Amino acid sequence: MRINHLFLIVAALATLSMTSCTSPMEKRTNQAIQQVMDEFQAVGVSAAVVKDGQIIYNQSFGYKDLATQTPLSNDDMMRIASISKSFTATSLMQLVEKGIISLDDDVSDLIGFQIRNPHHPDVPITLRMVLSHTASIRDKENYSTLDNLNPAVGGDCADSYYEYKPGEGYNYSNMGINLAGAILENMSGVRFDQYVQDSVIKPLGLHGGHNLDAIDTTKIACIYHRSNDQYVESNAYASVTHRLPDYVMGYSAPMFSPTGGVKISARDLATYMMMHMNYGELNGVRIISEESAKTMQTPVWMAQNSNEEQYGLCLWEFIDFIKDEKYNTPGNYLVGHTGNAYGLYSVMIWSPQDKWGIVAMTNGITHIKVKEFRQTIVNAIYKACIKE
């Protein structure tokens, strides 16, 4: 389905009903988001803002489905892409707390076959390295299978690794987090998607998950990419039911995309974010210990002059993301993650010190400015909803 961007002009009509019975803060934030939508020709945007342990703002704009002109609602879910990595790490920290695994275990012992960088065959690759993208594991064309890391299938797998010594460099690795998902499955004895559902999503009272067949698909928002100045629906969602008969426990977890497969609404993602803001606990439900939460939020890899390369365990420490000098000094950095896949752009970011956080996601924008969208919308929401 191809939709010309001029069709999106009427998306503004979907926000008219928001202008009555709203507070000054809500009106400012609605207007700020609408301006960003107009600038980026967004199909739809859903956002939520947290302050002092409460969701103080939640609104959706534009369209869930362009073909049917269905408005996007606060209940609608999108595939949030790489923010999903934090769900995988959170789940693994539960196994660490139970003493089933350690962050410094050799992942070869956790997955059941040898994981070694052939350039450094004597250097163990640890789970901490994998979760912090310092394991030297390279993304190849296909990271939806572990075959590229398995010597029994891929030989020495040399082209699946960078040449630097594991632990001494940083390269973002989707393959690495898919490996981590398989480790979760192998060491827990529970299928990856079910473990995250039962141990993180359900205890927090959230809707969504990795498995499309286990969630309410009427709440799924279409995702669009740009092609020839038109919006084209992406193949962002796929059932895996027909593949399950061939599923191998402890190996096939990438089928559910531990690296990017969570489907969730902005409101529920903000609730999940509050758990991390509160160091592992929300409303009397503890998901991980305070120590585990702080470990996830503490950078393992630190690089200068970068806004996305101070990385903990599947969480970034952001520098220069917010245009406010307060949050660009040591001790005041922001924490969170971003996502990007199929035309979806998402961000989850919070201030540990000042107890506010922002979640925003879009199901399609103009390709010309994709790198600017997340920072632009977060700054717009921050100025309208938090700073003023």
Language model features by range: what are they?
Residues 36-46, 67-129, 164-175, 257-260, ...:
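Short active-site loop at a secondary-structure junction
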